[in-house]
């Protein structure tokens, strides 16, 4: 695709219109309770907004230490909207299979059922937190690769809290060059880490687009957004 189209599509990764900070705080309060909500300080305006959720920077008290965290919050009514759209898609698949017999071999209805299962998992942030936690444990000794820590006391179905990462997206090539970071080496490292996790652990990040990979100040690769992970059975 053209570079111009690519830049427009990049906006879908983390630059969609956000919902208000007031709504965000209400969702956090409803999910975590008043006491936990009161322990969150410096709750920022949204720093990134995608189709399903948006992210705010904040601080929490972690056993006496103030930690910078990222709080991911599902969009209001997103589950309802997705279910309505999937129901419409299911009806469409049923009508196609009923009217065009040859399409039954495509198993369109089964595909829509699978899509519904996947999206239901992605819209319960506890599943993402569990995936991130497993990924963290698997990779904590991998040099040059860091998975943010999950804070379970600040995590629920609609809210996910993890370590804040100061980093540069791998899409920002000019900034990385200014920081004397070798882009070719980073690309090779990403591939090697991906293969290592898939082969060694049988568990890997399955959505490694530019918006989900950061390079921190130490030149380490930091993946974010663990809603889509892959698993391979070990031989």
What are the functions of these language-model segments?
Residues 1-197, 202, 210, 214-235:
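Broad phosphate/nucleotide-binding scaffolds in NTP-utilizing and phosphate-metabolizing enzymes
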């Amino acid at each position: 695709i053209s570079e111009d189209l690519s830049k427009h599509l990049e906006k879908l990764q983390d630059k969609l219109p956000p919902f208000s900070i007031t709504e965000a705080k209400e969702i956090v309060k409803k999910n975590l309770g008043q006491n936990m909500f009161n322990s969150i300080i410096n709750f920022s305006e949204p720093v990134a907004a995608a189709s399903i959720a948006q992210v705010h920077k904040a601080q929490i008290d972690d056993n006496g230490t103030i930690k910078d965290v990222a709080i991911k919050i599902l969009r209001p009514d997103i589950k309802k909207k997705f279910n309505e759209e999937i129901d419409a898609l299911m009806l469409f698949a049923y009508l196609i299979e009923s009217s065009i017999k040859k399409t039954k071999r495509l198993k369109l209805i089964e595909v829509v059922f699978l899509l519904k299962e996947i999206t239901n998992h992605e819209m319960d942030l506890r599943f993402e937190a569990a995936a991130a936690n497993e990924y963290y444990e698997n990779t904590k000794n991998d040099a040059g690769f860091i998975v943010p820590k999950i804070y379970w006391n600040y995590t629920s179905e609609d809210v996910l809290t993890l370590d804040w990462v100061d980093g540069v997206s791998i899409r920002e090539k000019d900034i990385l060059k200014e920081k004397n970071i070798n882009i070719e080496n980073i690309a090779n490292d990403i591939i090697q880490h991906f293969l290592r996790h898939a082969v060694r652990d049988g568990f890997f990040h399955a959505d490694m687009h530019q918006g989900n990979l950061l390079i921190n100040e130490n030149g380490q690769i930091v993946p974010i957004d663990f809603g889509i992970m892959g698993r391979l059975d070990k031989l």
